[in-house]
């Protein structure tokens, strides 16, 4: 979001938390601004701007500090949806945290007041961009630090010119008390402007030329399951190589993911079903053996009791 790009940053009339449809006739890449929303959280202002250019719709998030300093992130609408879901996980985790102990705050002060280790971390990867989300804490409180790194060699929605392979990064810090308000504002923009997202079918640099580009305007919704302390996310995406399923394994301090192409889903599903059936049979056999062992030790006693009852 360059200076002057956003209608809300220019001080346009919608006021705090107001949607502000706007458009731009010319400019670089003929970018059109579709909506803008402003949030005031503690002493910071956050702007969420939905924009569109020839490559599709995308979201720009800007943080404006008390001194006027700005940090900006750029997300495709598909990544924005993943980001919204991740915010839900952080909100849930934050709600379960108790207050910081005096010892923890004192330790933070001894370290110069800087953030302690992350209370929860996740990351998102899409094409040439990576997003790192860390819930941290310092003497001023808890906050979600969001860092974006961009490989300039990959192009994309908001990428400007730069030497191939060169990485740049931007970071914003969202006070934890504003997580729900921020998530709800983001969800509203996605609901209103994410339905016709061409990028969902083509990827940040994609078009209609790839194997899946432009052919899959609708994909299955993502889902997740929780097992003990782990959570597994299933997200369907599409890029120039076709449709894929990303399976992410998430623990409080760890995240790993695999990507399964659409043509292998049937084989993966068959393998899972086969192993589930085999394990069910193994468990049943073990249970039967356990019952037999228990019955063998007490069977005689049960029979004698039955005979005594008959004699009575």
Swiss-Prot record:
One of the record's GO molecular function terms: RNA binding
UniProt modified residues of type Phosphothreonine: 31
Acidic residues bias spans: 302-312
Stretches the record annotates as Disordered: 1-32, 284-312
N6-acetyllysine found at: 267
Gene name of this polypeptide: PURB
Protein name as annotated: Transcriptional regulator protein Pur-beta
Compositionally biased spans, kind Basic and acidic residues: 284-295
Localization: Nucleus
Modified residues (Omega-N-methylarginine): 24, 152, 294
Keyword entries, A-Z: Acetylation, Activator, DNA-binding, Methylation, Nucleus, Phosphoprotein, Repressor, Transcription, Transcription regulation
Family matches, as InterPro entries: PUR-bd_fam (IPR006628)
Family under the similarity heading: Belongs to the PUR DNA-binding protein family.
Function text: Transcriptional regulator which can act as an activator or a repressor. Represses the transcription of ACTA2 in fibroblasts and smooth muscle cells via its ability to interact with the purine-rich strand of a MCAT- containing element in the 5' flanking region of the gene. Represses the transcription of MYOCD, capable of repressing all isoforms of MYOCD but the magnitude of the repressive effects is most notable for the SMC- specific isoforms.
A Gene Ontology biological process term: regulation of transcription by RNA polymerase II
Entry's Gene Ontology cellular component terms: nucleoplasm; nucleus
N-acetylalanine PTM positions: 2
Gene3D superfamilies with a match to the protein in the record: 3.10.450.700, 3.30.2450.30
Pfam families cross-referenced by the UniProt entry: PurA
């Amino acid at each position: 979001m360059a200076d002057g790009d956003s209608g809300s940053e220019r001080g346009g009339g919608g006021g705090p938390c107001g949607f502000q449809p706007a458009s731009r006739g010319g400019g670089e890449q003929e970018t059109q601004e579709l909506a803008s929303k402003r949030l005031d959280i503690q002493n910071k202002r956050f702007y969420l701007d939905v924009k569109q250019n020839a490559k599709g719709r995308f979201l720009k998030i800007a943080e404006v500090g008390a001194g006027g300093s700005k940090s900006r992130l750029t997300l495709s609408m598909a990544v924005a949806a993943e980001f919204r879901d991740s915010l839900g996980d952080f909100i849930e985790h934050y709600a379960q945290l108790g207050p910081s102990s005096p010892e923890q705050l004192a330790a933070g002060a001894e370290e110069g007041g800087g953030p302690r280790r992350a209370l929860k971390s996740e990351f998102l990867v899409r094409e040439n961009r990576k997003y790192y989300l860390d819930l941290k804490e310092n003497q001023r409180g808890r906050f979600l630090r969001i860092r974006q790194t961009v490989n300039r060699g990959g192009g994309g929605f908001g990428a400007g010119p730069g030497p191939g392979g060169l990485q740049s990064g931007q970071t914003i810090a969202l006070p934890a008390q504003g997580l729900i308000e921020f998530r709800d504002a983001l969800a509203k923009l996605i609901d209103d402007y994410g339905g016709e997202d061409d990028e969902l079918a083509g990827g940040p640099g994609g078009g209609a030329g790839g194997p899946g580009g432009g052919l899959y305007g609708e994909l299955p919704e993502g889902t997740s399951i929780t097992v003990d302390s782990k959570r597994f996310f299933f997200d369907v995406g599409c890029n120039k190589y076709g449709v894929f399923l990303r399976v992410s394994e998430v623990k409080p301090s760890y995240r790993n993911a695999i990507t399964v192409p659409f043509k292998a889903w049937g084989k993966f599903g068959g393998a899972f079903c086969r192993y589930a059936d085999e394990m069910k049979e193994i468990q049943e056999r073990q249970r039967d053996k356990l019952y037999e062992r228990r019955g063998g030790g007490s069977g005689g006693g049960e029979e004698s009791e039955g005979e005594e009852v008959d004699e009575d």
